[in-house]
Amino acid sequence: MSKRSCQILTLLGLCLVCHEATLVGGHVLVYRKATSQLIEEFNDLPAQFGPNLPSNGLKVYVVPARRPYYGCDSLDRPPHLKYPPSAKFVALVARGECVFERKIRVAQNASYSAVIVYNNEGDDLEQMSAENITGIRIPSVFVGHTTGKALATYFTTEVVLIINDELPFNINTQLILPFSILIGMCFIIMVIYMIYKCIREQRRLRRHRLPKSMLKKLPVLRYTKNNANNKYDTCVICLEDFIEDDKLRVLPCSHPYHTHCIDPWLTENRRVCPICKRKVFTKGEARASRSRQPSLDNVTDTDDDTTPLLQQQQSNGRQVGQVSSASSAGGAAGSSSSVAAAAVAGTTRHGTFRRGHAGRNPFEESQSSDDENALLASTVRPATSSGAHERINPFDRAPNLPAHLAEQLTESRRSVWSRINFASFFRRQPAVISVAAPPYLERVESGTSAMGLPVTGTIAVASPASNNILNPNLSGSFKDEDDMPPHRSIYEPIAISTPAADSATVDDSAFLQTPTQGGIGVAALPHSASDRQFLI
């Protein structure tokens, strides 16, 4: 239970007490007539109907009702002969047998000035009410059972009653015990909570302070002037120069201070050096273990000012195997697969990729430039000897192959169901666009046909590392990406038909050009092992 809950419960208890106090509308005072001495005082509660009591009270003599004490049928008239002529009388009747309204009307008809109704069971006070208040001209009050029995004993000319509607301070005795328990529980909970907070605060302060027992283990030296080993001549706490034979306490960081300056700082403030903020540990003191979570945001309290902000990246053999397999698959599948392999390998906190030397892609090394090979060779040698991971440039070039060539180079073959394009049955077939071959291609083909050479064949593209034909070691292309149609590449062959010597039609896909522009260069190279000729 929090402190706020205790306050709410206390407020509710006070409201209940105030509510009970407001129900006590006045009291009945018992005086001895001869001496005007107050004998006893009782609490009462005025009724909701009838006239109000006078401000200075109503002075009356009590007359109890005869058996059965309810006063529902009739009441004896007041005994005026024994009392003074100006005396007023109040009828004392018990609760029950009839409604309050009937009791008041019967007493009014019997010439009584007021009515006191006492409870038949218990001392609880209840505010009387009536359905028809017409014709009621006398006031009435309600008292407890004990009060009614006590007032019946004052049926004498020597005792007079004064009934008023003052609001005395009164607390119902039935609420004292629950209210006391409530206040006591709130107080105990508040004390326990404050003790807990104090202990926690003391532990926190003690953890950041140096105990006095440990303070004695720090060395104390005497200052000597003109000493070559003195690097500091001023105490940074009091800003006073050291004088001869001063007691200086030297911290583990080699910073000296006056003993009367640094001792209160370490024992009452924090156990850190005021200059370098290094935590002070004495000789032989056990240091708390530094525990960090993988997240940099979760730092324990045991970290001091010398704790590195970036922890070393943890790696294991399983990650090395994943990197090797992912790198070999990525060299065949293109840039998208290489990036996925790099993601599996993980990156450092500085953004550089890691990979193992055992799983290096031979295709990437064969397609790199001489400078890059020299750089990689210089970084591979120490990694090979130590067997650890090496860092490479995050912008390391990866093969950029078209999707269909990357699929041809992968070892895994697609299933029969994956080769079927079900979407083609539900969409319209695009119109076939025929791209005519340039004139120089026709002249070359006519020359080869006249010489009796066979028709041109198809040359396989051997794992190019870039889409630049002039220099495969350079990544990129001379074409703008906006000019390239989606899912097309300069390596995509275009089937053309050339007449052969025997009027046969053979598909030729050796000529490489884009669908929108002409080829960059065309050369007819004879093949040494056969009589076929290839166009590059």
From Swiss-Prot:
UniProt-annotated stretches for the region Disordered: 287-334, 350-372
GO MF, one example: zinc ion binding
First and last residue of the signal peptide: 1-21
Residue intervals of every RING-type zinc finger in the record: 235-277
Enzyme Commission code: 2.3.2.27
Keywords: Endosome, Glycoprotein, Membrane, Metal-binding, Signal, Transferase, Transmembrane, Transmembrane helix, Ubl conjugation pathway, Zinc, Zinc-finger
Residues in compartment: Extracellular: 22-174
Segments on the Cytoplasmic side according to the record's topology features: 196-536
Keyword Zinc listed: yes
Glycosylated residues, chain numbering: 109, 132
GO biological process assignments: endosomal transport; positive regulation of transcytosis; protein ubiquitination; ubiquitin-dependent protein catabolic process
Family per similarity comment: Belongs to the Godzilla family.
Protein's name according to its UniProt entry: E3 ubiquitin-protein ligase Godzilla
Organism of this sequence: Drosophila melanogaster
UniProt lineage: Eukaryota, Metazoa, Ecdysozoa, Arthropoda, Hexapoda
